[in-house]
Design a protein with these regions (language model features):
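A conserved acidic beta->alpha catalytic loop
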Residues: 38, 52-61, 77
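Short beta-strand/loop segment that forms part of the nucleotide-sugar
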Residues: 45-54, 73-75
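A short, conserved alpha-helix in the catalytic core of glycosyltransferases
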Residues: 176-233
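Active-site-adjacent helix/loop segment of glycosyltransferases
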Residues: 22, 222-342
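Glycine-rich, basic loop-to-helix element that forms the pyrophosphate-binding segment
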Residues: 74-92, 104-106
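Conserved donor NDP-sugar-binding/catalytic core segment of glycosyltransferases
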Residues: 107-146, 150-157
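Short, acidic, metal-binding catalytic loop of nucleotide-sugar glycosyltransferases
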Residues: 37-46
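Short aromatic/hydrophobic "clamp" motif used to bind/position activated sugar donors
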Residues: 99
Length: 358
């Protein structure tokens, strides 16, 4: 949805010269052809880098022949989302201060990057910030992966302003503000590189899914802030990595969800939160069975098995990044999103009890 515009002035281009826009790619030649032009046109002097996860299509050839101005980091194997970015950002030039984690299926708009960088410049406590995410297919709608900024409920279930479970809101300007949130989307997130490296980037055990939520939770636990800036807008296709009903995605979401809560929840809240999550996971598995989706039900069982197998690892991570009380940070709904959505029929962020929002 990005529109064309005149090239940026020298002053505008220089303003983002300390930013690297890093696009992780795996067999996405068609997406690169479709979306790289908007990134090149509207990123105002930022360095554009594609980190390729050992693609077997013609992605590397497309970059060399059609986008020679784009730098390439070629991984020798498919490292997944987490390690793909971790290894790529380790190779960035030392003069860079910020990096954008940008999905290959995102179209950016004129002026998208400057407000995000400016917020980081003006607020040293902020370590990550995301723009407003709209849907590429339905430009008037907010998009699943990020929408108007990420929240968590008291059980650690993620949702967004503008997206409760699968229910999306149209964008009427209701989230045009700039404010702290619990998490920023990995579809388009600007990070402060000094903090990224200090916290060792994304959790490699996650491979993909919920990794940005874990990172942002660790940022808050370490005393940093995560923000949303609604004056910056990008358009996301979404669903480009794994199909929505893919058992592999079910496995990653449930396994990573347990690890996310275990790693980051304060000790005083952990036992009750984890017990409730485990119970709800079994309810979800039963629901899959009743619907005939046995592969997804088995995926939940494998997720639990593998979470427990790696429990000593997750314990070490808890010690490495000590959790804080959930209510001590913004972006938290101190109620149950499951109950609000399925029990009370709430479908919009504005319908949630404001007294329970931070």
């Amino acid at each position: 949805m990005a529109s064309s515009s005149s090239p940026p002035s020298a002053a505008e281009a220089a303003s983002c010269a300390d930013v690297a826009v890093v696009i992780l790619n795996w067999n996405g030649a068609a997406l690169l052809r479709r979306f790289l032009p908007s990134v090149l046109a509207h990123s105002n002097g930022a360095r554009i880098i594609v980190a390729d996860n050992a693609s077997t299509d013609d992605s590397v050839a497309v970059l060399a022949q059609e986008f020679p101005q784009v730098s390439l980091i070629a991984h020798a194997a498919n490292l997944g989302f987490c390690e793909g970015y971790n290894q790529a950002l380790k190779q960035l030039a030392p003069d860079l201060r910020y990096a954008v984690l940008l999905n290959s299926d995102v179209a950016v708009t004129p002026g998208w990057l400057q407000p995000l960088r400016q917020l980081l410049e003006e607020r040293p406590a902020v370590a990550a910030v995301q723009p407003k995410i709209r849907a590429q297919a339905e430009p008037e709608m907010l998009e699943y992966a990020g929408a108007g900024g990420g929240y968590l409920d008291r059980l650690g279930y993620p949702f967004c302003r503008g997206r409760l479970f699968d229910t999306l809101e149209p964008d009427h300007g209701q989230y045009d503000d700039a404010r702290p949130v619990a998490w920023a989307t990995g579809a388009c997130m600007v990070v402060r590189l000094s903090v990224w490296h200090a916290l060792n980037g994304l959790e490699p055990e996650f491979f993909a899914h919920m990794e940005e939520i874990d990172l942002c939770w660790r940022l808050w636990n370490a005393g940093h802030e995560v923000w949303y800036h609604g004056s910056s807008i990008v358009y996301h296709v979404g669903g480009g990595t794994l199909h929505k009903s893919n058992p592999r995605k079910t496995y990653l979401n449930f396994r990573n969800g347990l690890a996310l809560v275990y790693k980051n929840t304060h000790a005083s809240e952990l036992a009750g939160t984890l017990a409730t999550r485990l119970t709800l996971d079994w309810v979800a598995a039963l629901r899959f069975l009743l619907q005939g989706e046995t592969a997804d039900a088995r995926a939940i069982l494998r997720a639990h098995r593998d979470f427990y197998r790696r429990l000593s690892y997750w314990k070490q991570k808890r010690r490495q990044y000590p959790p804080r009380l959930t209510q001590q940070r913004p972006g938290v709904y101190r109620g149950s999103l499951v109950w609000a959505y399925f029990g009370q029929g709430k479908r919009r962020f504005s319908e949630l009890d404001a007294r329970l929002l931070s």
